[in-house]
Each structure stands twice: as structure tokens, then as C-alpha cells.
């Protein structure tokens, strides 16, 4: 197995630790994850599960047979074997993600299986981003033969080559920062341009791996966004061009550079490295399954914890020392909310709870943070919904105790949040850009509200005590359908016209929400012997929209496959669990 430095230089490696080449160059010798070994890591005497055999190109997730443990086992921190559980009505405590390392004192680890392109060619990469090209071009394609986005050593470039690379980079950076009202929080355009000038050769050896990593992720996300716009604007009757699209080649190139830098970033992270990891968690939503997305988000959170971004003291210090960087705390909150949503909907314990965060929420931060009131109010409600979602999951599925009084308190809290969301939707907006941005944000809040209802009323649906979950599923399907259905042509035009760097997150949320809603309706349909299969109107609407959304994010086809897989026997259910990202929900169908 070659070390990362030899891989980057495309040289043979002797496999020693350190290898001869790294010793000669006097650089740190780092090896990626060995796919021949079990990916479980020992952490404080416990096995911390690292998803096994998971690569960018894997279509299947291989699980391990779970070992049921009592809740006492977790509280006493005894050794347990985390796994992919076959969920029953309750959560298997053995599947809860480790809550250790919340103070950043333990060395961080990163599983490169989630991001490595070692076993992938360009064809795999393009397939994941929804791109295609003639197969015979893929067979002979080499990394240094891809379009105009080559990044060879600058020492061999003419001045014209340098100018061309600068123009290409500026174009991709402008894709990310073109709309001043919606740019990645905590990342400044001027800083990215400065990094671009400083690192003319992204593959050169220097001491700013975090800066190169951030620049590479920005350029990759810019290229992905640009290519997605090109694909959505392309005439379906127009024949495909020969060769690799230039922008797609650039995305592949910058992605490879970024992933090679991950070990160095994790070894000594700073603000640039954290921002780069959050951006990578963003665009990886179109490339890896939900479990991988959760793991990637948790790794970024671990870096944030190591940098103390979750603490009030760090915020207070930055107000004085570097107020221009306060947006990084908004980035932290965005990441935390996304992580909570993914964790609870996948039947996992969130990595970091609100009790361990002393950082003030966005609406309590000083006005030096450059964000619109709409975004700040959205973040306030989003944090409240994520907090409630975590509370529901812990009380109902981890501790298994939710008496009538507490249940009614949570219902009241959810009702109050629903009222606040309704009031926010009624706020008058007449600016065109803000109008379309608000539509996306309001739909996101509606989805998050539905997630809370799904978790809260899931047991009642299984026990046939109430249909609150069914009602929530029907309502959110109609709202998502009205936003994305191609039966209304303007929806498709709006998606193309307003597609920006953050396109993957809203589409991921919509697809995930529709899929869970469909499972809930399937469970409801099982109780109606007189109703034929696919006889629920909203279910058919949801499937139609999901089929439209996978044209933009192809990996979400997995979710559609989960809705149609046979689960007539326990054996069928066990087999489907190997690929089932939503087994926490689909296993309801076997109850």
C-alpha cells in the first residue's frame, strides 16, 4: 500500500513507515485507510465504528451482526460492538454514535474510504454528479489529459499558462461568491483570492495545507455548480460532446487534490481547514450515501470541537481579535443542525448535543456578522427544530421514557415552533432575489418540522394509536410537490435559474423527507386491506417528484429503490438492510 505522498507524486512506494521517499524528502509519511483491514478504531477502550468498505464508488454497505446491549452498558462505558442494527420498535443502544471527544482532547481520525478516488476513474466520478461521456474516452483518460483545468507544476509553466489558470480559478470562485446575499458563512472572497495567488501550484509542498485544502474545496464546489448548471440547461435532444467536459474535469482534479490533503488538515486543523471540511460535507451529499454524509459531518464537528468553536470563549476572543471571521460560527451552527438531522433520521445519537455548546446562537451574536435578517431568523428556528429533534430522539428512542406530561410538553413546543414558521412564511418579501431564497428556506423549515413529527409519532403509528405521522407526511409531500413538480414548468426554470453553490443541501433534505413520508404512507397502507397498492394519492405524488429530483442528484435513486424493495419475509428485510440508509424507518414495515 502506497503512502499519500507517493500517490500524489504517482511514484512507487516501498510501503515502509516512513517510506524511503518521504524520509529523503523530509516530509511526514501518511498512509490512508487500508481497505483490507477492519475499519473499527479503538477509542478510550471502546470500538468506535468506522463504516466498513465504504468508498465513493461503492453501491453497497456491508454491515456487521449487531450485539444487543442494555442501556446500562452504555452509561458505564463498557466495550461494545457498534454495527448496522436491524431496528425493532426501539433503538438498539449498541448503534449509538460515541459521545466521547467533546473537548477535543483525543486525537482526531478520518476514514479516507469516504472520499478516496483510489478505486474510481473519471467515469465513476461523472456518473455520481449526473454527467456522462462516451465510454471509449474514459478507457484512455489520464489525470493529466483532462481539458484545460490541468494544474501541473508552475515551474514548467509559461506566464500565459499562469494567467490562464488564474482566469479559470477566478471564474470558479465567482460562482461561489457571485451573490453577495448568499455566500458560504465564514469564508471571505478576498481570502480565497489571496489563497489562489499564494498557491499557484496546489500540489507543491509547503506548510499551508489547510489553506490549499480550503482553496481546492472552493474550486471543486464552484466547478460542480457550474457543471450542474450546464447539464440542467442542456437541450436533451442535443448530442453529447466528445471527451470530458472541461468543468467536470476541473471538479475531478480539485477534488483529488483536496482529498489528498485531508490527513494533513486533520493532523493540524485551523479555520481554513474547518471551512474546507464543511464545504466538502456540502458537495459530498451528491456523491456518498447518507451514512457517509453523517460521518463526514461528524468529522468536521470534531475539528470544530478541537478548535473550540462550540465555546462562548472562542467567540468572545474572535470579536476582539478578528471580527471579520465571526461568520465561521454561523458555519458551525449550519453544520451542527445538518448533523443532528442526519443522525436522528438514521436512528443515531447526535455527536454533539446542545448541552455541550456554549456558543451563542446567531440571533444573539453581534451585528458584525454579515447576514440578512431572513437568514438569521431561519437559523434561529432551524436550531430550535434541531434541538427539539434531538430531545425527541433521546427521550423516546434512547432512554425509552416519555410519559404523558412530557409528551404533551413536546407537542406544545412543536406546535409553537409551527406557529413561528407560519408567521415567518407570512413576512412580506418583494425583492426578487430574496423572494426565491425565502422559498427554499421556508421549505427547509417545513421539512425539519415534519421530521420532528415523524419521530414523535412513529411509535403511535406502529401501534395504530394515531395517524399524526400520516397527516404530517401527506402535508409535507404536498408542499414539496408544489415546489419541485415538473407539472408546473416554472418550477424547473426556477431551479435552473437560481441554482447556486448550496444546491445539494435543499435537494438532499427534500429527497430524504419524501422518502420517509413514503415509508410512513406504506405503513399506513398496510393497515388498509381494502386499499390497493399505490392507492394513496400523496404517495404517487412523492414518487413522481423523487424521480424528478434524481435527475439533479443521481445518488438519491437509492432512496427510490428502498421504497420498492420486497420485504415480504424477514430474510428479505435482512438482505435489504445491507443497502438501506433508512432502515430505521423501513423496518416499521416488518412490525
UniProtKB/Swiss-Prot annotation:
Per UniProt, the keywords (alphabetical) are:
DNA-binding, Metal-binding, Nucleus, Transcription, Transcription regulation
Tell me where it resides: Nucleus
State where it is primarily located: nucleus
Provide the GO biological process annotations.
positive regulation of transcription from RNA polymerase II promoter by galactose
Record-annotated DNA-binding residue ranges? 3-29
Q: What happens when the gene is disrupted?
A: Impairs pulcherrimin production and subsequent red pigmentation.
Record Gene3D superfamilies = Zn(2)-C6 fungal-type DNA-binding domain
Functionally, this protein is described as follows: Transcription factor involved in regulation of the PUL gene cluster that mediates the formation of pulcherrimin, a red iron-containing pigment composed of two cyclized and modified leucine molecules that acts as a siderophore, a chelator that binds iron outside the cell for subsequent uptake.
Q: What is this protein called?
A: Transcriptional regulator PUL4
Q: What is the lineage of its organism?
A: Eukaryota, Fungi, Dikarya, Ascomycota, Saccharomycotina
Q: Which gene encodes it?
A: PUL4
Amino acid at each position: 500500500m502506497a503512502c499519500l505522498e507517493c500517490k500524489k507524486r504517482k511514484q512507487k512506494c516501498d510501503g515502509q513507515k516512513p517510506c524511503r521517499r518521504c524520509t529523503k524528502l523530509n516530509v511526514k509519511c501518511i498512509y490512508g485507510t487500508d481497505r483490507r483491514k477492519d475499519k473499527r478504531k479503538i477509542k478510550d477502550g471502546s470500538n468506535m465504528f468506522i463504516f466498513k468498505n465504504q468508498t465513493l464508488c461503492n453501491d453497497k454497505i456491508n454491515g456487521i451482526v449487531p450485539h444487543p446491549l442494555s442501556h446500562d452498558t452504555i452509561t458505564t462505558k463498557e466495550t461494545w460492538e457498534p454495527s448496522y442494527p436491524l431496528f425493532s420498535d426501539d433503538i438498539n443502544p449498541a448503534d449509538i454514535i460515541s459521545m466521547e471527544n467533546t473537548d477535543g482532547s483525543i486525537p482526531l481520525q478520518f476514514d479516507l474510504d469516504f472520499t478516496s478516488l483510489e478505486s474510481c476513474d473519471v467515469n465513476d466520478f461523472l456518473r455520481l454528479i449526473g454527467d456522462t461521456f462516451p465510454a471509449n474516452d474514459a478507457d484512455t483518460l489520464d489525470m493529466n489529459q483532462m481539458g484545460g483545468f490541468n494544474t501541473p507544476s508552475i515551474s514548467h509553466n509559461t506566464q500565459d499558462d499562469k494567467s490562464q489558470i488564474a482566469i479559470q480559478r477566478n471564474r470558479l470562485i465567482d460562482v461561489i461568491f457571485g451573490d453577495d446575499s448568499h455566500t458560504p458563512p465564514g469564508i471571505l472572497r478576498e481570502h480565497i483570492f489571496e489563497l489562489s495567488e499564494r498557491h499557484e501550484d496546489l500540489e507543491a509542498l509547503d506548510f499551508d495545507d489547510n489553506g490549499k485544502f480550503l482553496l481546492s474545496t472552493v474550486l471543486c464546489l464552484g466547478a460542480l455548480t457550474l457543471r450542474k448548471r450546464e447539464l440542467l440547461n442542456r437541450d436533451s435532444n442535443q448530442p453529447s460532446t466528445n471527451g470530458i467536459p472541461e468543468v467536470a474535469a476541473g471538479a475531478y482534479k480539485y477534488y483529488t487534490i483536496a482529498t489528498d490533503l485531508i490527513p494533513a488538515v486533520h493532523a493540524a486543523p485551523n479555520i481554513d481547514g474547518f471551512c474546507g471540511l464543511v464545504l466538502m460535507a456540502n458537495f459530498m451529499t451528491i456523491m456518498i450515501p447518507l451514512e457517509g454524509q453523517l460521518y463526514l459531518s461528524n468529522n468536521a464537528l470534531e475539528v470544530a470541537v478541537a478548535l473550540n468553536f462550540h465555546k462562548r470563549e472562542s467567540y468572545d476572543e474572535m470579536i476582539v481579535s478578528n471580527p471579520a471571521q465571526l461568520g465561521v460560527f454561523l458555519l458551525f451552527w449550519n453544520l451542527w443542525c445538518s448533523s443532528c438531522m442526519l443522525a436522528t433520521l438514521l436512528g443515531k445519537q447526535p455527536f454533539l448535543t446542545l448541552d455541550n455548546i456554549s456558543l451563542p446562537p446567531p440571533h444573539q451574536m453581534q451585528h458584525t456578522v454579515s447576514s440578512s435578517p431572513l437568514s438569521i431568523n431561519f437559523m434561529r428556528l432551524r436550531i430550535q427544530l434541531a434541538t427539539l429533534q434531538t430531545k425527541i430522539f433521546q427521550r423516546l428512542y434512547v432512554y425509552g421514557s416519555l410519559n404523558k406530561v412530557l409528551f404533551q410538553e413536546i407537542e406544545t413546543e412543536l406546535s409553537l415552533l409551527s406557529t413561528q414558521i407560519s408567521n415567518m412564511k407570512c413576512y412580506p418579501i418583494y425583492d426578487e432575489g430574496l423572494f426565491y431564497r425565502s422559498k427554499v428556506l421556508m421549505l427547509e423549515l417545513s421539512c425539519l418540522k415534519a421530521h420532528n413529527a415523524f419521530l414523535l409519532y412513529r411509535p403511535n403509528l406502529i401501534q395504530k394509536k394515531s395517524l399524526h405521522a400520516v397527516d404530517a407526511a401527506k402535508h409535507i409531500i404536498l408542499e414539496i410537490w408544489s415546489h419541485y413538480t415538473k407539472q408546473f414548468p416554472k418550477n424547473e426554470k426556477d431551479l435552473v435559474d437560481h441554482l447556486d453553490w448550496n444546491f445539494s443541501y435543499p435537494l438532499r433534505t427534500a429527497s430524504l423527507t419524501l422518502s420517509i413520508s413514503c415509508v410512513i404512507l406504506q405503513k399506513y397502507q398496510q393497515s388498509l386491506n381494502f386499499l390497493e397498492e399505490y392507492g394513496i394519492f400523496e404517495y404517487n405524488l412523492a414518487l413522481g417528484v423523487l424521480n424528478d429530483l434524481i435527475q439533479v442528484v443521481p445518488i438519491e435513486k437509492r432512496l427510490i429503490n428502498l421504497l420498492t424493495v420486497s420485504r415480504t419475509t424477514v430474510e428479505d428485510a435482512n438482505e435489504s438492510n445491507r443497502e438501506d440508509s433508512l432502515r430505521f424507518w423501513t423496518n416499521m414495515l416488518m412490525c
